[in-house]
Amino acid sequence: MDIISKSGEGNKYTINSAIAFVAYASHIDINTTEFSKVLSGLRDFINDEAIRLGGKISDGSFNKCNGDWYEWLIGIRAIEFFLESETNFIVVKMPNATSFDVMSIYKSCLSEFIYDLRSKLSLNNVNLITSNPDFSIIDIRGRREELKSMLKDISFSNISLSTISEIDNLYKNFIDYAELEHIKSFLSVKTTFRPDRRLQLAHEGSLMKALYTHLQTRTWTINPTGIRYYAAATSIGNADVIGLKTVATHSITDVKSLPQSAVDEIFKINSVLDVDSCLSHILSS
């Protein structure tokens, strides 16, 4: 299978992101390589193939694939972490919002409240437009052994297209699954925190918390555990720390509630060890 394919006329090629990822992973030890170096190595690997074929790859193609590759790196290690530990939580990669609504993870009796909210807002010419966090951290008490058996072959030492498919489709096992407290938190990841990405994350975190509060209100849940929203990138600067402390807007509309940050914490995830450290902290919070 080819890691790149010709795109129309001329010398432009597109990246077959999963095939390229699997092919490159067979040449390196991801367990000991910084993720930023994996991404730059993939770029060189693909560009070398494009040059060999007399073609070129656009920066836009790499930008799209970088996000996929970074999520697969984190997603695969997160499953390894689950298999190696005794945790009752699993980190599930979410698809794009255009193909799946993250609220569908909740049981239908809960998600229907969100659909009802959307419908009522639309009557007032207002749209509830949400993006999906990249990962949901879900309580799987009672299903641990089933999931361990299902996911036992996922490993950096054995990456295949089947591995990628399992990571990408794991969410299907959790549709109509969660009670209000079963989703512990969300994690969204970017290779880098550009200013526009910081705004996107703050908006997403604020909205996820507002929707949780809406469900809490509709179900009359007293003293809920709440939901947390985290962000991560291969590197973090002071501007990122400050920018992602933006307030969750729903928390300043009621004087009886304490202000909340849209993003609870940010993490540097640039290696397997960073993934482990991040997940250990999130699961103990």
UniProtKB/Swiss-Prot annotation:
Q: Locate the coiled-coil region(s) and give their ranges.
A: none
Q: How is the cofactor bound?
A: Binds 2 magnesium ions per subunit.
- SUPFAM superfamilies of this UniProt entry? Restriction endonuclease-like (SSF52980)
Q: What is its EC number?
A: 3.1.21.4
Q: Report any Pfam family annotated for this entry.
A: Bse634I
UniProt keywords, alphabetically: Endonuclease, Hydrolase, Magnesium, Metal-binding, Nuclease, Restriction system
Q: Which InterPro entries match?
A: Restrct_endonuc-II-like (IPR011335), Restrct_endonuc_II_Cfr10I (IPR012415)
Description of how the protein assembles with itself and partners:
Homodimer.
Protein name (database record): Type II restriction enzyme Cfr10I
What is the scientific name of the source organism? Answer: Citrobacter freundii
Q: Taxonomic lineage of this organism?
A: Bacteria, Pseudomonadati, Pseudomonadota, Gammaproteobacteria, Enterobacterales
Gene name per UniProt? cfr10IR
